[in-house]
Amino acid sequence: MSSQADYDKRLAEEVGSLSTRLVTAVNKQVELEETILELRKQVSALKLKNEQLNQSDIKLKTILPKYIKLQDDYRETLTKKKEAESQNTKLQGEVEDLTASLFDEANTMVSNASRETHNFKIKNRKLYEELDEKNIIINDLQEQLQDLKQMFIKMEEQSKIQSYSQSNTPKIESSTDFNETNSIHTNTNFSESKLSKYNTRSTLGDEESQNYNLQQLQRIIYSPLITSIRFDLNNYNIDFKGFVYQLIKPDFQFDLSHLKTIPFFKSIWQSEIENCIHYIPSLPATTTLLNRWQKGKTFWGSLIEGKVSIEPIKGSNETFKLTYKGNNASGNSSNENTESISNRSSATGSVVPVAIKDPCTFCGEARNDSLEHCRLYHLKLFESNTANNSGNNSTNQDQQGNNDNTHVIASYPLCNYCLIKLRNLCDFFAKIRLIRSNIFKLKQNDSFDEFIVVPGSFGQFKRSNTISNRNGTYSSSSTSSSSTSSVSSSSATTANGESLNSTTHNIQLERTEESKLIKLYIMMLLIRSKIFWSKLGFWDTIDQINEINLDEIHYEAFSYLIPKPTQQQQQQQGDIRSQSNFNSPRQSVDGRSVLSGSISSPRQPNLDKQQKDSIVDETVAQLQRDGVVRSETASAEEKFEDAISDETNGQEQLRSEKLQTGKTVTEPNSVSESEPVQEPEQVRSKSNNNTNNKNKDTKIEDSDAEHTFSLKRSHSKQFKDQLNKELDQTLEMLAENIDFDESSNGNGNGN
C-alpha cells in the first residue's frame, strides 16, 4: 500500500511539473504569436513605404527635367526683362521730349486763342453797345405797348362782366349779406328762405306716385359698356396708336404746338377741348409782357404741364356736396338737405361753406341764390423755374403739384359748372402726361410714323422759300400756291379717307402690347366722356354718377377685347408678305418707278430704313389704288420738304423721269440704293431751265444720270432746317396769339 501511495505521489508530482511546463510553453507560444503579428505589421508598413518611395522616385524622374527647363526659362525671362527695362527707359525719354514739344505747341495755341478771344471781346463789346441802344428803343416801345394792352384788357374785362351780368345772371337780392372779405356764409335763415320755393311741388299728388316718378328719374341716361367699344376702326388702330407711340418717343417735345401736330390730339383739341373754355382771362399786370400777350398759350401750357391747382376757398366746401343736391332734387330731399346743412352749420361753425363775391372768371356766373351757383373754388396758375425753356420738356413735368413751382401767376374764382370742366381738363392732360411717362413700358414702334399727318396750322404766316445761287436769287412764291394746295388737298383726302375707314391698316402688335393700348384707349374715352358731360352740365356727387375704376383692372384682362382677324385680313396680310419678298422693280399707279426687294450695295447697313419705307409705299399703293405714292426716301422728304412742295406739277414729272433714269443706270449691277436727293440750288436751276421742249428734257436727263451719285450732302442743310424750325415755331406762336385775340374780340362784340 505504501508503494502504491508513493507511486501516486510521484505521478502527481510528475503531472504537476508537466502542467507547469505546459503552461509556460503556452505562454511562450502566445508571446511568439504576438511578436509574429507585430513583425507582420511592420513588414506591411515597410511595403507601403517602399511603394510610396517608388512612386516618388518615378515622379522625381519626370519632374526633374521640367524643373531644369523652368530654370532655363527663368534665366531667359530675366534677360528679356533687363532688355525691356532698358527700352522702357529709352521710350520714357522720348515721351518726355514729346510732351515738352506738345506743351510748347499748346502754349502757342493758347496764346493765339487768347489773342483771338481778346479781339472778339472787343467786337462783342461794340455790338453790345449797339444792342443797348436798340434795347432802349425797344423798351420804350414795349412800355407804350404795355399801356395799350392794359387799357384794352380793362375794357375787355369790363365789357365781358357787363354782358354776362346783364344777359345770363340775375341781380343779387338785397337780402343777401356779404362780409368785408367778399365771402358768403350760409346759415339756416339763408338756406330756408332760398330753398322754400322749391318745396311746393312736393305737396302735389300722392306720395306713392311721387316716389315712382322719382325712381323713373333716377335712371342712367346713356352709358355704353366696355365690351361695346369698337377696336376695329382707324380711330383706334391708326390714330390712337400713332398718338401713343409718337408721345412716348424720347425726342418728342411735350408742348401744345407739337401735340397739335398729331391728328388724334388735334381732332380732340378742336372738337372737345378748345370749346370748353370760351373765354380765357387776362393775366395780372405783375406778370411779364410776353405772358400777358400770350395769355391763351400760357393758360393751356400750364394745364398741359400740370402747373395748376384747383383749391376750395375753405376746407368745408368739399363736404357740402355730400348732403346738398342743388335745385334738381325733389322738394322733400331739398328740405332734408337744407335742414342737415343748417343743423351742421349751427352745431359746428367749421363746416360752413365760404364763397367769393366776384363772378366766375370763365363763364361770368354771378348768382348767389344757391350753393351750386356760388364761387366756392379758385384756380391757381403757377410759374415754374423752367417756364421760359419751352423745349426742355421731360417726364418730370408729369408730376402735378407745387413741388417745382416758384410762385402763383394768377388766381381765378370758379363756379361749380366751370369747376367740373376744369377738373376734367386737368385730368385729361394728366392722363396724357401719364402716357408720356410710359408707365406701362410700351416698346418703341415706328410703324405708325407714316400715318402721322402734320398739317400746316398757320398757313397765312408760311414763308416763301427763296434760294440764292450764283446768278441771283430765285423765289418760289409764285408757284407755292398751287403746290401747297395740291399737297394739302392730297393730305386732306388721305386723312378724310382714313377717318371714314375707307382704308384700313391692321398693324399687328404683341398681345400684351395690344392689351396695354386698349386700357389706355378706354382710359382716354372715359375722361373724354366726362369732359363731354361736363360741358352739358351735371351734378358730380358720388351717388349720382357710376364710374369704373380702371386702376383695379389689370391690363391683361383687356386682352379679351382684342378683335380677332378675319379671313380676308389674313389673306391680305399674306399678299403683303409675298409682295414684300418680290425682288424686281415695278411701276406704281401714277407711272413712277418704285424700288423693292433686296438692295445689295456696300452701304447696306444704312439702307434698312429706306427698304422698309419702299415696302410700305408698295403696300399702300396696292391698297389705295388711286393714291399717289412718293418714291423718295423718308429722310429726303423731311429735309427738303419745303423745296419739293414749291415745285410745280411739271417739275414733279421731271423728278420722276430722273428717278427712272437713275433706275436704268443701276439695273445692271442689281438694285442699288435709291436716288440721292439733289441740292435745292440744282433743283431750282433745273426748274428754271426746264421748258416744254422734249430735246431739252432728254439733255437734262443725261446730265442727271452722270452726276446723280456724285452729289454730297452739306452740313449747312442741317443748320437751315434748324433755322426753319425755329422760325416756324415763332410764326405758329404769333398765329395762336392772333387767333386767341380775334376769338376774344369776337366774343366781346357778340355779347
UniProtKB/Swiss-Prot annotation:
Protein family according to the UniProt entry: Belongs to the SEC2 family.
Bias kind Polar residues: ranges: 574-587, 595-608
Superkingdom as given in the UniProt entry: Eukaryota
Region (Disordered): 326-346, 469-499, 565-724
One annotated GO biological process: hyphal growth
A matching Pfam family: Sec2p
Modification Phosphoserine, positions: 584, 598
InterPro entries (UniProt xref): RAB3IL/RAB3IP/Sec2, Sec2_N
Keywords for the protein's UniProt record, in alphabetical order: Coiled coil, Cytoplasmic vesicle, Guanine-nucleotide releasing factor, Phosphoprotein, Protein transport, Transport
Residue stretches of biased makeup (Low complexity): 327-346, 475-494, 667-693
Protein name in the entry: Rab guanine nucleotide exchange factor SEC2
Compositionally skewed regions (Basic and acidic residues) per UniProt: 694-709
Record has Phosphoprotein as a keyword: yes
UniProt subcellular location: Bud neck; Bud tip; Cytoplasmic vesicle, Secretory vesicle
